[in-house]
Design a protein with these regions (language model features):
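A glycine- and small-aliphatic-rich helix-loop capping segment at beta-alpha/alpha-beta transitions
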Residues: 55-65, 79-84, 104-108, 131-144, ...
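Internal helix-turn-beta structural module
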Residues: 324-410
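Accessory alpha-helical/coil subdomains and C-terminal extensions
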Residues: 177-180, 202-283, 287
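Short beta-strand segments
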Residues: 43-45, 67-70, 117-122, 181-187, ...
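Active-site segments that bind and position negatively charged phosphate/pyrophosphate groups
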Residues: 263-339, 347-348
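An N-terminal, well-structured beta->alpha segment
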Residues: 1-43, 51-52
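Internal gly/pro-rich beta-alpha loop/helix module
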Residues: 134-220
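Glycine-rich oxoanion-binding loops at beta->alpha junctions
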Residues: 71-112, 154, 158-159
Length: 410
């Protein structure tokens, strides 16, 4: 392993994530918060829910009750006056349903003088859920979508119609109370109705689109689910104010600044990366190989969210697969590629992403690993573990997509 490049990668990752932590972003958004004279209730959902709620309660001084639902391992302690729950992601589980039921109960019977502060971040589609079909069927449909390679917009177009809280329905449940929503964006282009499936945003998708997606991926659906896909969701809400704060653009900008401080000349390739993870990795590896040997230190940055088509039975995530796919092109070069999820998790693993450099391919071959066979089996985690290329940050408390970087030192 190239220890200098790995050290640089770790510094860039740390600086990038620190720049998009929700604390300051929430406090900035609260400058525009004007609650009515009645009760102020807080509901937070998503991977960043605990940190967002903690920052909000500290800034406001008090709330009259609240519910937080976040991913397992993401609750960092008690928040005064708030009930905190952990639940399943990327597939909702019984705790997702139970916590969301608590949130719905909290907002029942509110008046026009009451205010709901709704804090939303990525992951909310799984964590904040009250299904309109049996829970087991919703889990099966979610697994089908995850395995199909459907992108996040396609997935959420389906999930909205199978939920009592998505697609604007949570805001309807809060009415006539005012809803002030603060959103951390984890979807490219920041489409508010798609972030966590838009519980407090009028739905911009149509039932025709939902049915087309179901047909495209040949989803196995019950008659009840098919009927729900054919029904429209709320298209207008008059009790909601929404403020977006934090996005992949800020993540990429922070990565570029960190690269600059380490002596690299950074170039942002895109902040809308959306393709197969291994294709993105191969591309970044090819870029690094093309520019290797130059005197100037270079950094190529890509932000977004790739997808993985599951064909094997291995363990990994999109960032780990992206990194491993870059390893063959980097062989023998003074270059590295790393990719990390800003939330600190990547797939069903304890890793946030993966790192490879010019030594990785040879190190894996010496241990009997074939990169291409490993990618076919979707087993990037164990290969990177063998090459000491796992990136483990722990839960970060934020979630604004992923960032991948190719570093070239000459």
């Amino acid at each position: 392993m190239n220890t200098t490049l790995r050290r640089d990668a770790d510094e860039i990752i740390h600086a990038s994530i620190q720049a998009v932590l929700p604390d300051k972003a929430v406090c900035r958004a609260l400058e525009n918060f004007q609650p009515r004279d009645g009760r102020v209730l807080l509901v937070a959902a998503g991977k960043a829910a605990w940190q967002m709620a903690h920052a909000a309660v500290q800034a406001l001084g008090r709330v009259d009750g609240g519910v937080v639902v976040t991913k397992y391992g993401h609750v960092k302690g008690e928040i005064p006056g708030i009930s905190c729950y952990e639940a399943g992601h990327p597939v909702p589980d019984a705790n997702s349903f139970a916590a969301t039921e608590k949130a719905l109960a909290l907002v029942q019977g509110l008046t026009e003088e009451d205010t709901v502060l709704f804090l939303l971040s990525g992951g909310g589609s799984a964590l904040f859920e009250q299904p309109l079909v049996p829970g087991g069927e919703l889990q099966d449909i979610t697994n089908q979508l995850l395995a199909s390679g459907a992108d996040i917009v396609e997935m959420n177009t389906i999930r909205k119609r199978l939920s009592a809280v998505k697609g604007g329905r949570f805001a309807q449940a809060c009415a006539p109370a005012k809803v002030f929503s603060i959103v951390l964006s984890d979807i490219l282009g920041d489409p508010l109705d798609m972030i966590a499936s838009g519980p407090a945003v009028p739905d911009g998708s149509t039932c025709a689109q939902a049915l087309a997606i179901a047909e495209k991926y040949q989803l196995r659906l019950s008659a009840q689910a098919k009927a729900l896909l054919a029904q429209e969701t709320p298209k207008a809400l008059d009790n909601v104010t929404t403020q977006i704060t934090g996005s992949v653009r800020e993540l990429c900008a922070a990565a570029a600044e960190a690269c600059r401080k380490l002596g690299y000349a950074p170039l942002l390739l895109t902040d809308r990366l959306c393709c197969e993870a291994r294709e993105a990795g191969s591309f970044l590896g090819a870029i690094a190989r093309t520019h290797a040997g130059q005197e100037k230190k270079l950094a190529f940055i890509a932000g977004g969210e790739t997808v993985v088509h599951l064909t094997g039975k291995g363990l990994g995530g999109r960032n780990q697969e992206l990194a491993l796919a870059a390893a063959p092109a980097l062989a023998g070069q003074n270059a590295a590629v790393f990719s990390v999820g800003s939330d600190g998790t990547d797939g069903p693993t304890d890793a946030a992403g993966g790192y490879v450099d010019g030594d990785t391919a040879a190190a894996l071959a010496a241990k009997g690993w074939n990169v291409f066979d490993t990618l076919k089996n979707n087993d990037a985690y164990h290969a990177l573990q063998a090459a000491e290329g796992l990136i483990i940050t722990g839960a970060t408390g934020t979630n604004v997509n992923d960032v991948a970087v190719a570093l070239i030192t000459g």
